[in-house]
């Protein structure tokens, strides 16, 4: 259980207000743990890595091997919001702080698209794609997010023209 010391906040947060929020937080936690609330079909992450299907591990290894054989040195992660931030946080949390500097020739550079539709950013991404062997990963819960869809179409068009 997480414990929070709000002693310094007592002049700003009334005791009754705090207790009401604690009740709401505990209720939300119970719904999450029971996996019966809205969005319950999107809770597969709760069981990782202990319940990762071997077929998923194999599929990831196959993609890795395929990309290595094609000398992929640029991976474009396309997503927005939690889709983009989840990937970015996982990469940063699991990587050496200076991974790019230490392993620049062994590990593909990871860049992001869809979170920023500035025309300059997209143009610069295409410049980068023109001098690198690129692959992309699209992350979208709904598949209908405008920014993700636009970025994917642009990246896909360039990849099709290149390969």
Residue spans for each PLM region:
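Glycine-rich phosphate-binding loops that contact phosphosugars or nucleotide phosphates
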Residues: 65, 69-163
